[in-house]
From Swiss-Prot:
Part of the 50S ribosomal subunit. The gene is rplV. One of its GO terms (cellular component) is cytosolic large ribosomal subunit. PROSITE patterns: RIBOSOMAL_L22 (PS00464). It comes from Blochmanniella pennsylvanica (strain BPEN). Signal peptide: none annotated. The keyword Lyase does not apply. GO terms for molecular function: rRNA binding; structural constituent of ribosome. Disulfide bonds: none annotated. This is Large ribosomal subunit protein uL22. HAMAP family: Ribosomal_uL22_B. The keyword Cytoplasm does not apply. GO terms for biological process: translation. PANTHER family: CHLOROPLAST 50S RIBOSOMAL PROTEIN L22-RELATED (PTHR13501), LARGE RIBOSOMAL SUBUNIT PROTEIN UL22M (PTHR13501:SF8). Gene3D superfamilies: Ribosomal protein L22/L17.
Amino acid sequence: MRTISRCRYIRSSAQKLRLVVNTIRGKKVSQALDILKYTNKKSAELVKKTLESAIANAEHNDNSDINNLKIIKIFVDSGPIIKRIMPRAKGRSDKIMKRTSHLTIVVSN
């Protein structure tokens, strides 16, 4: 049975999240958690939290055995961009783009 977990409006760019997501795509859940535990990136903690939520959903909703779970699908979409202006010299300004993203993880046995 497929179980989905989503984390939306993450305050990190999709590009940074995809670096971590690509390392665990298609792996068993236990192996993916080990990889995320030793990955030294902020986005690894966010992906780990969402993966643990997917595991809990599978265990609670579908009574799945967590030892057999595998990541079937994992992807990151870009979310809305918060735009800010930073004043610069001589009356100019720069745009600051605060990017967000949406993470979706699908696990199955």
